Every structure is written in C-alpha cells, then in structure tokens.
A protein has these predicted regions:
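Charged, low-complexity intrinsically disordered terminal segments
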Residues: 1-477, 481-569
Length: 569
C-alpha cells in the first residue's frame, strides 16, 4: 500500500515536471537581445523626432509652417544610419509597382528605389530582419535571396486577425512608426504620416521587443502560455519614459494590440488612446481612416470603449473635438450616424464643440480613388498618439498593431519645437484644406455615392488605387484553434471580417466585362442589426439625398445652439 502511494506521488511529480517543461518551451525566446550592449539602464534619453509624410503630388496643401520630411527621404536616412541590423514590420510588401500595373506616376519609382536600398544592405554587412503576416510577396522572396531573415506570423491561427503593425527599428537606436506600409502607393499615391525618432535607444529598445515578439511567433499556431522576460515592456502609461525630445522634456511609451500579444508591463493600444483622451483639457483632434464603434459579426454590437470617452470629454469636460475621417469606397454608412450622434450631444449645450470632416480622395479616369488620407493619429493639448489601427472595434480585438504615445507639458517657451505642436499644425493644415468636406444633413457624401453608383473594384481594406491582380499565395492557411480565449469587457467573442490591404484576387473575365465583385470589410450591407445601442441616437437627420456635399470653404460645427457655422478659408 505504501509503495503504491509512493508511485502515485512520483507519477504526480513527473506530470508536474512535464507540464513545467512544456510551459518553458512554449514561451517565446528572444536571442541576441544584448549584442550591442544597450540596456534599459544605459540607453539614450536625449532624442530627436521628425515628422515624415507622403503627400501625393496632386494634393495641394496650404503652407502653414508645418515642418515635415518626405517619407522616402526619412526612410533612406534610417538606412544611412544603419550599422548592424534593420528590423521591419509591415502588413504589405508591394514595393515593385511594375509587378502590378504600369507606373503612370514618377513617384511610383520610389518603391523600387527603396527595395533596391534594402537589397543593398547585405553588401554593407547589415542584417535585415522582417516580420510579416502570411502573405505571398515577390519582394520578400527577393529579399530572402539577399540574406534577409523573413519570419512569417500566422495571425489567422493565432487571433483570426491580421498583422497590421508598421514600424522600423535600426540598431535599437533609431526607429520609425506610422501609417505607411512597404507599398509603393505609400510612397506615391497615398497620404501617409509617421514619425522618425533618432538616437533614442530607450524607446527603440522597447519597440524592438514588440518586433521580437512577432519574430519569435514564426509559424506558431498557438499563443504561448507566458512570455519571455526579454519581451516585457520597459515603459507604460503608469511608468512612462522620462526623456528629452527636440530639447524639450517629455514622457513616452510604446503600446500594442491585441491583448493576447501583451507581455507583462505593456500598455495596450486602447489603454493608450483612453489615457490621451482623458488627459486632454482643451482639444482633441483625431485623424483616422475609419471610425466605427461597433463589434461586427452576423449582428453588430455597440462598442463604447472610445466613443464613450469622446462623449465624456465633450459633455463633462467641455473639450473641443475635431474628427477628420477618410471618405472612400469602404466607408461604412453607419459612420455618419455615429458622427451625427456625437454632434447631437452639443445641441443647446454651452461650450460644447464637436466638428467632423471627411478627407475626400480624387476619382481617377478609370473610376478608382487616389489620395486617400491614410493617417492614424490623435493630438491633444497635452499629448499625441500615433498608431497602426483604425478606430473600429474588431481592429483592437484581433489585429496586431503598435502605437507611440508622447506627452509634453504646457508652458514650454518654444512650443513650436514640440512634437505635439508639430502634429497639431499638420492636423490644422489638413483640416482647413480644400480637400476636406463637412457632413451635412440630407446630403450623401460623395464617397458613398461613388460606392453605391458604380461597381466597386475588388480590393481589400485601405487600398486607394484600382484593382490589381494578386500573385497566387503559398502561405494561405485555414484558421486553427486558439489555446487562449478572447474577452472584451463582457462582450461576446466575434470573428473579424476585416480584410488586410493585399490586392484581392479578381475574376479577370468578370473584370473584362466591367463587373467586379464587391468585397465588404466589416459589414453586411442592408442587413445591419444593432444590439445594446440606443437606435434613436443613431437616427440620421433626414434621409440621404443624391446631392453633392458642401463646398470646401464650409465647416460644420455643433456648438451651443448653433447647427451650422460657415467659415471662409
């Protein structure tokens, strides 16, 4: 009897040991973390930041003193500074425009030039590391032949989402983060914005840890039970980095999504966005592609995480809010209902100001859209948030993205030198440009008319050019079961219907006949059901008419008892 008990105890111990070993080996391991000697104790805190933008040649913006560097020039400057390693995460790799369509714009050559520079890193003895979703890309294969280390992350199996992060880390000293993908259109036809940060190894090392997390997930089909300590965040919203940027004091940290990709101490993107909104005292300016506070599945469910904070800022703190949203084929019609709902809060309310505009792309001869405002940032009187995800519920639950928060105190003498003021100037320039339109009652925005009145090119989310043939993929994988479950504040789990930015496979016979299939992203048109939502708040004022929008010089505002106010630009 006693020997039997001993056997049971030994067997139990062996089982525990086996489980422990399995947990250890399931953790993501990061190699080479301290090769260059940079640690959180000796990292550099005296940094310089520069805004980088791609503004298409045919978009004319007033010069309001906004200082920015062309995106291509900024990326080249990072490559010029590289000594040991360049790490890149991008949702797309479509730099060689000639593979898809004849390049009708000289600016499209920038993509091929950047690809050539990346290929040339090998000759300089510089290592190129890339983390990518499971995409089929000629560019990635070409770079792999030039000794680039390409690791693929199976997001379908891990979260049923997509890898949408877009950033560079160079030698763990310099980095870029912003809206641009490694896509020739990000260097030519799209309006993009990001920030380059130089000689800032503290933040660069922290962003490198986000890269290392993706890098270590290559081909895994489950979320590790725990993360390596070397992936823990160095800074977060409760313990930000105190540093100097452009000779002014500031605080900063890196955020990321989704929650299942959050190691210890890392703030997620929703926490970062919430913090920036809650800390605002005078204004909140938001420039985003899509704004849709819904969780989408067969039925839509109201998602209040961001929308509720904006309402609180308007009503309780009397903070002025401006919302600049891209107007394009994939703009969800319910977006306008939510914006009207926000504006209605300021009816008959003193010192309440909510304004909304749409950045209008241009319709090309072939019917495609060009010049979509691809920006994804928020600026307040105290801080900025610059991220990779749109403000749609499913984005934060399933897709991988990263963000940068920088806060700077008020009362700085040379306010124009601060990143906060530079980003505000960029927002103001866009807001008052002739390319923006205000939402008016009883008038349908041109982007939705464009969508409803002609066949939509078969394309995935956030593509502003015409249809392009996809190259057959070899990494297509079916969803695999996850080890971890997802929760969102009591909401039921829903599967994302968001599509990434890769060109969608097109039936060329149908395209030749002028009919191209419509691919929706996070909606089922005509069958929208909303639960947990006061539908009376979403009732649009009047019915949409087939009328053009207001002229560029008109700005809509809800402020006190005013329904509309005119502003001459």
């Amino acid at each position: 009897m006693e020997s039997q008990q001993k056997c049971i105890v030994i067997f139990a111990l062996l089982c525990c040991f086996a489980v422990l070993v399995a947990l250890i080996f399931s953790a993501v391991d990061v190699w080479g973390e301290d090769e260059d000697g940079i640690t959180e104790e000796n990292c550099s805190k005296n940094c310089r930041a520069v805004l980088v933008e791609n503004i298409p040649e045919d978009i004319s913006l007033l010069d309001n003193g906004t200082a920015h560097v062309p995106l291509s020039v900024g990326l080249y400057s990072l490559l010029d500074r590289a000594i040991r390693v360049v790490e890149i995460v991008s949702p797309l790799w479509l730099l060689n425009s000639s593979d898809y369509e004849s390049s009708f714009q000289p600016a499209a050559r920038q993509g091929r030039a950047l690809l050539s520079r990346l290929q040339g890193l090998k000759a300089k003895g510089i290592q190129l590391k890339i983390s990518s979703g499971m995409i089929d890309s000629t560019e990635l294969k070409m770079l792999a032949r030039h000794n680039a280390e390409v690791h693929y992350v199976n997001m379908t199996a891990l979260t049923k989402g997509h890898l949408l992060s877009s950033f560079w880390v160079v030698d763990r000293r310099h980095f870029y983060i912003g809206s641009a993908s490694m896509d020739w259109r990000s260097l030519a036809t799209r309006k993009e914005l990001g920030v380059l940060v130089y000689n800032c190894s503290c933040l660069a090392l922290d962003l490198h840890r986000v890269f290392s997390l993706y890098y270590g997930l290559q081909y895994r089909d489950f979320i590790p039970s725990f993360w390596s300590k070397r992936l823990f965040a160095l800074f977060n919203k409760d313990a930000p980095l105190d540093f100097t940027i452009n000779n002014t004091k500031a605080q900063a940290y890196i955020s990321s999504s989704p929650d299942v990709f959050i190691p210890k101490h890392r703030s997620n993107d929703l926490e970062a966005i919430s913090w920036v909104i809650q800390e605002a005292r005078h204004f909140i300016y938001i420039s985003i592609i899509d704004y849709l506070p819904l969780l989408s599945s067969n039925a839509h469910k109201y998602w209040s995480r961001i929308d509720g904070l904006i309402r609180e800022a308007l009503i309780l703190r009397k903070v002025r809010v401006r919302l600049l949203i891209s107007c394009w084929e994939k703009t969800e019609p319910l977006t306008f209902n939510f914006i009207w709902s926000l504006r209605s809060l300021c009816m008959e309310q003193a010192n309440c100001s909510m304004e909304a505009k749409f950045f209008n792309p241009r319709v090309q001869r072939d019917g495609s859209l060009q010049g979509i405002n691809h920006n994804r940032f928020m600026v307040t009187d105290r801080a900025i948030y610059l991220g990779n995800l749109d403000w749609v519920g499913n984005e934060f639950l399933f897709n991988a993205g990263a963000g940068l928060v920088i806060s700077q105190p008020e009362g700085i003498e040379d306010r124009n030198s601060t990143v906060v003021e530079q980003l505000r100037a960029a927002f103001d320039r866009d807001w008052f440009s002739r390319h923006t339109r205000s939402l008016q009652a009883n008038k349908i925005p041109i982007c939705i008319k464009h969508q409803n009145n002609r066949p939509v090119p078969g394309k995935a989310s956030h593509i502003d050019n015409g249809p392009m043939p996809i190259r057959t993929g070899q990494h297509d994988t079916a969803p695999a079961p996850m080890r971890n479950s997802h929760k969102d504040d009591g909401h039921t789990l829903v599967k994302t219907r968001y599509h990434d930015e890769r060109p969608t496979k097109i039936d060329h016979q149908g395209f030749a006949n002028g009919v191209v299939p419509i691919i929706d992203s996070y909606r089922e048109r005509g069958q929208v059901k909303i639960s947990n939502l006061d539908t009376s708040q979403l009732q649009n004022k009047g019915s949409y008419q087939d009328n053009p929008m207001d002229p560029p010089s008109q700005s809509a505002e809800s402020s006190g008892s005013r329904e509309m106010s005119n502003r001459s630009l």
